[in-house]
Amino acid sequence: MMNSIENEEFIPILLGSDMNVYGMARSFNEAYGKICQAYASDQLAPTRYSKIVNVEVIPGFDKDPVFIETMLRLAKERYSDKSKKYLLIACGDGYAELISQHKQELSEYFICPYIDYSLFERLINKVSFYEVCEEYDLPYPKTLIVREEMLVNGHLEQELPFEFPVALKPANSVEYLSVQFEGRKKAFILETREEFDLILGRIYEAGYKSEMIVQDFIPGDDSNMRVLNAYVDEDHQVRMMCLGHPLLEDPTPASIGNYVVIMPDYNEKIYQTIKAFLEKIEYTGFANFDMKYDPRDGEYKLFEINLRQGRSSFFVTLNGLNLARFVTEDRVFNKPFVETTYGTNQSDKARLWMGVPKKIFLEYARENEDKKLAEQMIKENRYGTTVFYEKDRSIKRWLLMKYMFHNYIPRFKKYFHVKEG
């Protein structure tokens, strides 16, 4: 039974309509029995036909001025009851940035567990993020920053400071969302100089203005990746950290880097390194780090920080660390910090998170000890998904989610290849 502090009336408001939104809505439903309200510019499949999240579609809501005008109107029309608390949670990069930009105005009506925009800008842009990594002695891959003015007739004339293959990705992921060109991917692994010149030229021809990041490709397949989700409270104390070991990624061009199978993991060095960093920069809210093990020097190299919970972060809730509970206890119930809770892989409660059908995992994940352990977890029924939720079942929803999962079969057949380096 809830104690008196948890009887306080609050309403979770989610921004977006993707799997991240559904994972947060499910976390709130599991923890508090809440039905969430979401606002988005489009209705995406993971939240369709749901009984635990109501999505209101507002065209243009993912950009200003529609975003801030709508939020201030909603605040006055629907969220003005002083006896209630309204918790605002972004479930995508663009929405996280919009909340941070308008934090002062929005905080008059909503609880906004986000950092100020000055810090947000430093961390979200990969150029300044790698400068921050230098400052705080965090390992990251060898990097070359490319600016448009460095190109001559659409080509970068200088030699790269490392061998091919290389990784190429935008420094400004929010700006890149609206840039379209032939062969567009979220990020690229390029094998030759010719391929590199072609793609780089197309990106800037398409109107992208910010820097591009060229990096030494760290050898190894998806099983060398790690993902870390953290929650940091209003006083900059890290309340929760949960490390995941991705065993497979989505190979679809628009979704490269999205994890589709994650096993819980534990690494004391990673936990303490990231915890110290978050506290030093006075972070607050959810954070999500992508990193990869480099067998050449034994270090985990940071790729980026997402200033929100990760798209696949329901793996944290699935493993007993309910994401909604951490932010609610901090910001709504004002429960004091006691100690950092760390995710582990040792418990018999450890669960494998799956975003694709089992047959995809069994066919495409690399054969190794981790896969054997994951197969054992599946045999013991110690696995789960974000979108198949027993308290949110209907024929329409079940069929749509089955169709969504089935779609991965032709996608993997068409796009999958092993990343060896």
Swiss-Prot record:
Name of the featured protein: D-aspartate ligase
GO terms assigned for molecular function: ATP binding; D-aspartate ligase activity; metal ion binding
More about this protein: The substrate D-aspartate is provided by the coexpressed aspartate racemase, whose gene is adjacent to that of the D-aspartate ligase.
Domain ATP-grasp stretches: 130-332
GO biological process: cell wall organization; peptidoglycan biosynthetic process; regulation of cell shape
Catalyzed reactions: [beta-GlcNAc-(1->4)-Mur2Ac(oyl-L-Ala-gamma-D-Glu-L-Lys-D-Ala-D-Ala)](n) + n D-aspartate + n ATP = [beta-GlcNAc-(1->4)-Mur2Ac(oyl-L-Ala-gamma-D-Glu-6-N-(beta-D-Asp)-L-Lys-D-Ala-D-Ala)]n + n ADP + n phosphate + n H(+)
EC numbers, comma separated: 6.3.1.12
Binding site for ATP: 161-224
Note on how the cofactor is bound: Binds 2 magnesium ions per subunit.
Organism of this sequence: Enterococcus faecium (strain Aus0004)
Root EC class: ligase
Membrane-traversing stretches: none
Alphabetical list of Gene3D superfamilies matching this protein: ATP-grasp fold, B domain
Cofactor: Mg(2+)
Binding site for Mg(2+) 1: D290, E304
Residues at which Mg(2+) 2 binds: E304, N306
Chain's role: Catalyzes the addition of D-aspartate onto the lysine residue in the peptidoglycan precursor UDP-MurNAc-pentapeptide. The ligation occurs between the beta-carboxylate of D-Asp and the epsilon-amino group of L-Lys. Is highly specific for D-aspartate, as L-aspartate, D-glutamate, D-alanine, D-iso-asparagine and D-malate are not substrates.
Keywords: ATP-binding, Cell shape, Cell wall biogenesis/degradation, Ligase, Magnesium, Metal-binding, Nucleotide-binding, Peptidoglycan synthesis
Record pathway: Cell wall biogenesis; peptidoglycan biosynthesis
SUPFAM superfamilies xrefs: Glutathione synthetase ATP-binding domain-like (SSF56059)
